[in-house]
Amino acid sequence: QNFNYIFEKSDDPLFHRQKVLNEMIMESDTEIVVNYDCDVILPMSSYESAYKAIREGDCDVVYPYGQGMYQKQVQANDGICSDFLMSRDYNHLDEVSKIHTSDYGWAQFFRKKVYVEGGMENENFRAYAPEDKERFYRFSMLGYKVARIKNYVYHLEHSRGENSWFNNPHMQSN
């Protein structure tokens, strides 16, 4: 079985993403795990290169997109997303994208052993927080082999709720 579904009900208005990610990491029985935001799409070659770099021992952590002007901000609607899913033609996304900066979030491939040894996700962060930068610096400073693939990340733009922007009630303590 390649897929396991777990549902965890919560009435807490705060989505404690880092805690949920840590629980999923510990449930995983694979050598490689991916911290993957649901609003991004990568070129297939990026998935393959990131996986291969860890599998072959070249890296412990891989950011499957470049740093700098490597984000394609996609202003997509349901029709464009459906067209892309049916055809797998990235031109559908490119037509409604603009280039923007990319840094630390979206997706990271990890050797699971390294992710656990390095402390996994920092549960002291709550809601929207600078956890993406903290994670990058922590794993780099701990001496793990962190690399990037110089390719684009497609970020599906969306509205922001209480848990997903700078104005969340926990930002000051993060």
Label each PLM-derived region with a short phrase.
Residues 124-174:
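C-terminal catalytic/acceptor-binding lobe
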Residues 17-22, 39-40, 47, 103-108, ...:
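Conserved glycosyltransferase catalytic-site signature
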Residues 43-123:
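Conserved catalytic core of nucleotide-sugar-dependent glycosyltransferases
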Residues 28-31, 120:
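Active-site acidic short loop of glycosyltransferases
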Residues 1-11:
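Acidic donor-binding segment of Leloir-type glycosyltransferases
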Residues 30, 58-60, 144:
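Short, high-confidence coil segments that cap the C-terminus of an alpha-helix
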Residues 11-27:
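Glycine-rich, basic loop-to-helix element that forms the pyrophosphate-binding segment
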Residues 31-41:
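Short beta-strand-to-loop acidic/aromatic patch adjacent to the donor-nucleotide binding site
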